């Protein structure tokens, strides 16, 4: 089976310690990194490119076009299809979005979604439902998200339906200095074989703890020409 290491992490716009985030990502050696709150303002493309380079990864899609979500991959990962999603802005709330991609490692394809849900409960649920409807039509699927909500909530249930909650036994992920809430998730298709899941603490380089999963892709992956339906 083909091994795959995945990281999901909220990096708080690299405001705390951009070099520390890059060093932590390099040390974690992910094949796929799904980042939330990546730089999204003026010149953010350059900041995200620098982050990827310093971490030894490739910037694929995201940043401002995906409302702060960012997809980075290692050199061994091939990109079949990738695009950014920007959802309509709601009054008094931040714009939300996602990165969606179909990736390939050793000839085996899989779909990924990275997103950051709203602070408002109703908006959170609506965003989760919209994104689930647009998941790449390529099993197996991986989702990395900051849900701004905890297990059992309607939004968490909507986003995780049919997937395995890889971090369910790891404890809270926020805030980094004294974690009290588990609002970050790595979700995986049951077809993946899970070797190990961790919640390392890289120090105060951002306000969330990362989630890291070592997985194995199934021997045979179903393929499809690209992602699912557009998000509206």
Predicted segment positions?
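N-terminal, active-site-proximal structural segment of metallo-dependent hydrolase catalytic domains
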Residues: 1-50, 129, 217-232
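Active-site-proximal beta-strand elements of phosphoester/diester hydrolases
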Residues: 3-13, 81-83, 100, 109-118
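Active-site metal-binding loops of divalent metal-dependent hydrolases
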Residues: 11, 38, 115-117, 145-147, ...
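Active-site environment of divalent metal-dependent phosphoester hydrolases
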Residues: 14-16, 39-44, 120-123, 147-154, ...
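Structured beta-strand-rich core segments of catalytic domains in phosphoester-bond hydrolases
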Residues: 32, 37-109, 198-202
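Active-site neighborhood of phospho(di)ester-bond hydrolases with catalytic His/Asp-centered motifs
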Residues: 33-36, 60-62, 142-146, 165-169
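Metal-dependent phosphoester-hydrolase catalytic domains
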Residues: 77-84, 89-90, 136-141, 148-232
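His/acidic metal-ligating clusters that form di-metal
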Residues: 100-105, 111, 125-147, 151-156
